[in-house]
Amino acid sequence: MKQSKVFIPTMRDVPSEAEAQSHRLLLKSGLIKQSTSGIYSYLPLATRVLNNITAIVRQEMERIDSVEILMPALQQAELWEESGRWGAYGPELMRLQDRHGRQFALGPTHEELVTSIVRNELKSYKQLPMTLFQIQSKFRDEKRPRFGLLRGREFIMKDAYSFHADEASLDQTYQDMYQAYSRIFERVGINARPVVADSGAIGGSHTHEFMALSAIGEDTIVYSKESDYAANIEKAEVVYEPNHKHTTVQPLEKIETPNVKTAQELADFLGRPVDEIVKTMIFKVDGEYIMVLVRGHHEINDIKLKSYFGTDNIELATQDEIVNLVGANPGSLGPVIDKEIKIYADNFVQDLNNLVVGANEDGYHLINVNVGRDFNVDEYGDFRFILEGEKLSDGSGAAHFAEGIEVGQVFKLGTKYSESMNATFLDNQGKAQSLIMGCYGIGISRTLSAIVEQNHDDNGIVWPKSVTPFDLHLISINPKKDDQRELADALYAEFNTKFDVLYDDRQERAGVKFNDADLIGLPLRIVVGKRASEGIVEVKERLTGDSEEVHIDDLMTVITNKYDNLK
């Protein structure tokens, strides 16, 4: 394709709000253009890359007998009300109503709709298992869209849904999808690591995320250097081994602590280590207030709280609620209280005596507080985030941290949707059973961004061969010179039969062409310049920067060999 005919609006300067390198490069290289916050148009080069990604996805889906369909983005509210998610999903769900006052959502996922499609069709165990997938735009009203395609309000996704008669069948499809996702990310050129994760608003009993390692990633991965253990930090278990500090129990004392708000400020004020301070936070669990205690250097993990209490209906109490309940602001809370409120403490709190806690009075704290004498703990548990260097639950050694971008996730949904939506089949005994489900998503547009995030240098994008928008970049330095133009035209005609060629035939300065070529990042470059009359051209590899002069008689062989050896 001739570059003069392709819409590639490269930029010299990018908006300052483009923080992620992938966002900057996708804008700068003319692959995407922002329409409004979190919404982008995919221009010709990006569209070609997306087509290459989706081709790989389709191949791997078909390999495991997943069948493609296409569902509407617009979903009626009644389906979401059946599952209970219409009220539970929150403000991220884009809601609208038609001229008749009927409520709809622009789908972020399609569990409800796909369940409604199959519930009256998959009637017998003989029709199972069945896996359906689609590639489609999704919508989520992000509070703060950022990082370009990594967190947008409209995005392209491959979502698949499987239906089963028993757990063994679900396990097999889950494993098939897990392996298919691993192959997909390897093929598109992403270093992605599967990690144990939380299922969030989608629900389900078991899930893995596929995380593309990147410094810009918004998720923290906990992993082992000695085993294949990897988990999202929200799910990483903290191993508790008792380490009691045997100090003499001291009398309870109330002290004034003016202008002290945080655990670190309190530790500094008292001249004590922050891990001897105990923080108290108040949550509402299904409408009931509880206190949760952790040591001063630890942070409460609300995902673990949801898992522990078996409900998503958990939220941090507001400042007004806290003041009304205990008469003090959040920085002064403590478990020594004359109100009926259940107290839960992280396992590591029980290692301490003579605790320092809030006095439930602004500007005051209690020291030498002891469990059993001054207050009681209803239950201990793992309620906090793991720290780097702590022991991992698989016994392999210390926890290490890395940042990652979630590019895919697989879920075992069980009967969460089929039960609420009455999707049943007859088993081999003729009894009605709820369909057992799995769901599996890949962020296609996010994968595009993750590829760029992991495959670039200071000059621009470096496309992996499998997804590159074109294989070769043919550049005529000066098309006004007959020998250069004629040779470039001839090479374009020859190589276009075997490769996808982008032919830069523009009337631009050489520097502009080379800068654009580096930005766009095609794997191989053929430059027709001042030695065209001798039949000599330059061949350059984008990844290594290696270049050599080649006679046109040898050019096809050289290019074919180099291309075959590309990754």
Curated annotation (Swiss-Prot):
A GO molecular-function descriptor: aminoacyl-tRNA deacylase activity
Q: Which SUPFAM superfamilies match?
A: Class II aaRS ABD-related, Class II aaRS and biotin synthetases, YbaK/ProRS associated domain
Cellular component annotations (GO), alphabetically ordered: cytosol
Reactions it catalyzes: tRNA(Pro) + L-proline + ATP = L-prolyl-tRNA(Pro) + AMP + diphosphate
- The Enzyme Commission number assigned here is 6.1.1.15
Keywords assigned by UniProt, alphabetized: Aminoacyl-tRNA synthetase, ATP-binding, Cytoplasm, Ligase, Nucleotide-binding, Protein biosynthesis
GO terms for biological process, alphabetical: prolyl-tRNA aminoacylation
Q: What is its main location?
A: cytoplasm
Judging by the UniProt lineage, the source's domain of life is Bacteria
In Pfam terms, one family for this protein is tRNA-synt_2b
List the subcellular locations: Cytoplasm
Note the HAMAP family from the entry: Pro_tRNA_synth_type1
Domain free text = Consists of three domains: the N-terminal catalytic domain, the editing domain and the C-terminal anticodon-binding domain.
Task: Give the UniProt family note.
Answer: Belongs to the class-II aminoacyl-tRNA synthetase family. ProS type 1 subfamily.
The record ties this protein, via PANTHER family, to: MITOCHONDRIAL RIBOSOME PROTEIN L39/PROLYL-TRNA LIGASE FAMILY MEMBER, PROLINE--TRNA LIGASE
Biological role = Catalyzes the attachment of proline to tRNA(Pro) in a two-step reaction: proline is first activated by ATP to form Pro-AMP and then transferred to the acceptor end of tRNA(Pro). As ProRS can inadvertently accommodate and process non-cognate amino acids such as alanine and cysteine, to avoid such errors it has two additional distinct editing activities against alanine. One activity is designated as 'pretransfer' editing and involves the tRNA(Pro)-independent hydrolysis of activated Ala-AMP.
Instruction: Describe, as the record does, how this protein assembles with itself and its partners.
Output: Homodimer.
- Give the protein name, as stated in the record: Proline--tRNA ligase
What is the source species? Staphylococcus aureus (strain COL)
